[in-house]
Amino acid sequence: YMWRINKALPRRGNIGIFNRSHYEDVVVTRVHDLIENDKIPKDLVNKNIWKTRYRQIRDWERYLAENGFHIIKIFLHVSKDEQRDRLAERILNKKKNWKFSIADINERRFWDRYQDLYSEMIEETSTEKAPWYIVPADNKWFTRYVVSQIVLKAMKDIAPKFPEMSKEIKEQLEEFKKLIESGNIGMIEEMQDVMKGGNK
């Protein structure tokens, strides 16, 4: 269940955003008893499978952190009443009809089960290197503000910098600068000589 997430990891220096990700496999899969349909050895489907998956997730996220990944996990918590109002708005407001899905209505029947599993998931997988941030999400402006502050702090902690240029590249840039300032930027041959390290 982790392979699809693992292969979608961002390259070093890039940022990746996962919507739900591997955490579906310890929540949705349990709500709807989908584990029996997974193509995994049957002897692995036992009473310890969820504890095992929690451990695997913690181990995987620790591995990522130890290899330079900065992990931010945000849980947007919408109340049951607010969810009801938003679903009603999607039905009543023509401009929001495109957001409507009957699946969202059906899932509300499992609200309590979801809340129990979300709580367990957060407790089992929130760690020092990969903590969960639980953000109240009834008020969208407040949610966006809190999330932006979480991301901003993380970016400040990471303190990203532009790649360092080699001495050779810096020298080539100076030559290009001279070409531009002298009005000779169109002289392709001369620019090619500069790239080769020449200086005619």
Please state what every model-predicted region is.
Residues 114-200:
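NTP-dependent small-molecule kinase module
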